[in-house]
Amino acid sequence: MKIIAIRIGDRYGPEYEKYLEEKLPQHEFIWIRKPIREDVLLQWNKMYGMSLDIEEPIVVMDIDVLLINNYDDLFNYPIKRGQFISIPGWWRDTENKRYKINGGFFKYYPKDCKYIYDKFM
């Protein structure tokens, strides 16, 4: 499975990449180190995965995730075509309780989400 992670700028050093690659050697990393377009703000670069023309699910994750215990279960969590999986948000920065996803970890089939990329990018 491919994992996409963003490391743009100097807030996080290459040791963060090394940490994730050592924890997840069975996966292929795609590192986004510069904006996919000049007009794209940092967090929106995560949408790059939705533009990929591949038939397998991918994970898009934050670079500053600490992997502990049996984290393979998270990456191996089953997903069906048409599903979009995220871990729950642990903070409440809004009063709307319907907003539950965490932007730090997504799993989806890129081709199923291409329409989102096309609409917003």
Residue ranges: model-predicted function:
Residues 58:
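Short aromatic/hydrophobic "clamp" motif used to bind/position activated sugar donors
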Residues 1-43, 54-55, 110:
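N-terminal anchoring/stem segment of glycosyltransferases
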Residues 19, 49, 70-74:
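A short acidic, amphipathic alpha-helical/loop segment
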Residues 46, 61, 101-104:
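Residues that flank catalytic or metal-binding motifs in active/ligand-binding sites
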Residues 108-121:
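Catalytic core and acceptor-binding pocket of nucleotide-sugar-dependent glycosyltransferases
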Residues 62-66:
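The conserved acidic donor/metal-binding loop of glycosyltransferases
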Residues 47-49, 84, 105-107:
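Conserved hydrophobic/aromatic beta-strand scaffold that supports enzyme active sites
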Residues 67-101:
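Conserved donor-nucleotide/metal-binding helix-loop-beta segment in metal-dependent transferases, i.e.
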